[in-house]
């Protein structure tokens, strides 16, 4: 297999989950991805955006992790979780995928807006990186394999 580096941008979304989903995912229960309505909506959004997670022969590629987010709700907020002045900790599903760094801003804006629409929080945590390099497969011809001598 031939590997080449590809210029991409990283999209990371922090998604609140309940304790049961957190526990199931931590135990490796893959069914929890489909059983949790929020994560299922996030994965549908990934599947609907062909630009996200495109690694050639593999589509809709993502990575995930579990963690906690901490915050204190300020006056004037309309929180989904927590109360004004109270420090709150939320079990969190951290979703990461990549897209081509050359993708135009209109397409990036479209899928980012979609994530904001379906995210349960008043202010979702969505990170977009500057271009970075990640490995991917390259056609054999790129390396002169199989080419006539």
Question: Where are the language model's segments positioned?
Answer:
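Hydrophobic structural segments
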Residues: 1-149
């Amino acid at each position: 297999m031939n590997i080449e580096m590809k210029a991409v941008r990283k999209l990371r979304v922090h998604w609140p989950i309940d304790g049961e989903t957190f526990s199931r995912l931590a135990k490796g229960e893959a069914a929890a991805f489909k059983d949790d309505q929020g994560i299922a909506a996030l994965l549908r959004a990934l599947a609907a955006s062909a630009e996200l997670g495109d690694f050639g022969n593999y589509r809709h590629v993502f990575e995930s992790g579990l963690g906690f987010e901490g915050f204190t709700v300020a006056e004037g907020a309309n929180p989904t979780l927590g109360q004004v002045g109270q420090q709150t900790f939320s079990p969190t599903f951290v979703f990461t995928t990549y897209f081509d760094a050359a993708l135009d801003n209109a397409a990036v804006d479209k899928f980012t807006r979609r994530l904001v629409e379906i995210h349960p929080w008043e202010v979702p945590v969505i990170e977009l990186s500057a271009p970075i390099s990640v490995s991917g497969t390259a056609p054999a011809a790129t390396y002169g394999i199989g080419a006539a001598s």
